[in-house]
Structure formats: C-alpha cells, structure tokens
Curated annotation (Swiss-Prot):
Minor structural protein that forms a portal-like structure at a unique three-fold axis of symmetry, following binding to the host receptor. The channel formed by VP2 may allow the delivery of the viral genome through the host endosomal membrane. Its main location: virion. It is found in: Virion; Host cytoplasm. This is Minor capsid protein VP2. Homooligomer. The portal-like structure consists in 12 copies of VP2. Interacts with capsid protein VP1. The keyword Glycoprotein does not apply.
Length: 225
C-alpha cells in the first residue's frame, strides 16, 4: 500500500515537472516571438529612417542644382564672371558709342535680357544718382538703347533721354566705397520716349562691387528686360 502511494506521488511529481517544462517552453516561445517582432519593427524603422535620409539628400541635391542654375542664369558663376571680366578688359564687346573701356561695363546676363550696360563715368555717391544704365531692346537689337536712370546731364540730349518712369528697378550695393551694405531703388528711371521702342519690363537688377573701386569695377546682373 505504501509502495503504491509512493508510486502515485512520484507520478504526480513527474507530471508536475513535465507541466512546468511545458510552461517554460511556452514562455520561451513567447519570448522568442516577442524578440522576433521587436527585430522586425527595428528593421522596418531602420528602412523608414534610411528612406527619409535618402529623400533629404535628394531634396538637398535639388536645391543645390536649382541654386547653381539660378547663379549661372544671373551670370554670377566664376566661369561667367571670369569670361565677362576678360571680355571687358579686352574691350571685346562694343558699346553704342565706343568700345568697352575700363570705365564701361557690359553684361549679357541671361537669355531673357539682351544686354545691360552701365557707363561708370561721373558716378555719383548715392545709389540713385549713378549715370547711364541702359537696357537693350530685346525684340529688335538694332533699335536705340532704352535709357534707365540717367542723372548725367551729358546724356540729356540723346534720343533715349527723359521719358516716363519704369517701376521695379532696384540696385543693391554690397560694398559702396567704405560704406556699409545697402539696398535701394533708382529714384529716376527713364525709358525711350518714342513709341517705336518698347520699354518692356525690368526686374532683379543688382549691383555687386569687385575690389574697392565700385565706380569702375561694378558688376550688374538682371533676370528680365
């Protein structure tokens, strides 16, 4: 009888051990399943992070390409500036009255602007008193230049002299002699008074100085004329 009871206790103990082992196996399986799910979630999160980083890089490249295109369009990239300066110093581009000299500047700044010219002689101290900014007529280059902002009395007798005003012409000086940076607009902007020459529109004209002599070595750029 005692041996039968002992056998029964042994059987119960063995069954409890088996049940404990089964529970342990189930718990381990659950832990492994949770760990696997965590690894999968981390993997998906890593993929999303890489995708966002790649998109950010693409956006940065697009912004760089756009900025480079805008700089080139304005003729302010180093290659364009070097070509322009070399052409100016060599007098390669003709003016309406004389070849380009060290006192005259010429810039083909974009495919929208035929040309922008600036006569630096009698250059004033203030932004709105410089002389002789002229815009070439885009549709018919053989027509006379349009006079813009002529405060120089020597130009008053020209056929492109005083006329109606043109809005939206602004000049920015990054270095005006020893003064500080400034932003302003021309107070006297003029166009050809004759109806045969259309004034068109002027936008985004800026003035940048190269070196310390803005009256001779200034660079204009424009986005539309």
């Amino acid at each position: 009888m005692a041996s039968a009871a002992t056998a029964g206790l042994t059987l119960l103990s063995g069954g409890a051990g088996i049940a404990a082992d089964i529970a342990s196996i189930v718990t381990e399986q659950q832990r492994l399943a949770l760990q696997k799910e965590q690894i999968r979630n981390n993997y998906e999160l890593g993929k999303q992070t890489l995708s966002l980083q790649q998109q950010a890089m693409e956006n940065s490249r697009d912004r760089i390409r756009l900025s480079a295109a805008q700089i080139k369009e304005l003729g302010l990239d180093p290659k364009s500036e070097l070509s322009m300066i070399m052409g100016l110093t060599a007098g390669a581009q003709p003016s309406i009255s004389a070849p380009i000299s060290s006192e005259q500047l010429f810039l083909n700044s974009s495919n929208l602007a035929r040309s922008v010219r600036w006569d630096a002689r009698n250059f004033g101290e203030a932004i709105n008193t410089f002389a002789g900014l002229r815009a070439k007529h885009q549709a018919n280059p053989s027509r006379p230049d349009m006079m813009l902002g002529s405060d120089n009395p020597n130009w008053g007798a020209r056929v492109t002299g005083d006329a109606l005003s043109v809005s939206g012409l602004s000049v920015r000086s990054n270095h005006f002699g020893s003064g500080s940076s400034s932003l302003g607009s021309l107070s006297s902007v003029r166009t050809n008074p004759f109806s045969s020459v259309s004034s068109g529109s002027v936008g985004g004209i800026s003035l940048r100085t190269v070196g310390s002599r803005p009256s001779i070595r200034s660079v204009f750029s424009t986005t539309s004329v």
